[in-house]
């Protein structure tokens, strides 16, 4: 589907990542449109959301579209708002009120996040821990290097908090869409690790056993690696996914 817009007709979202973003209303629903820049995030958003659905995870669903913006044609994705009636949206950065301490190893940083979130809001500790590990493990599989505290979202409805669906995968898959085999993946992984800004990384140092349990459950849900091969997503992205799954399960 192709949409046509003029810049002065839409409310752009600024200071929000690398892509051009704005909201539209369609069939009485609100959708976020994310237009590609040079980083070509839309293909990565789509692949990751298709994988998350195959794994049985609660994820934003990205639909591929084309956007003509000021007479220029772009690839883009759109996704329905995940907010329900009565929801209030908070990111972890705002909940904490400050950035977690630097100089912590991965386990120390993870525990710091857990303890300080628990000090700020009323949320079940097991639920909090499991959802953060689920997110971090999925980000590991897709090589998402941009899971910072501002795109980890909690939704409050009444007195209860829940996590938003997974979203924001545009900096995944080693910033590359054209792998034809696995030979170049290790080098790209090393380069990617140096630029990894994620709040939670090195999951092997946090709870490796639990992360492996998650991945095995996800594989069972989607039909194993053969099921991933059947997904309608970029071939290079599939190679990264399968490489990272094997890497994690063999740690």
Question: Positions of the model-derived regions?
Answer:
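Conserved ATP-binding subdomain of kinase catalytic cores across diverse folds
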Residues: 1-101
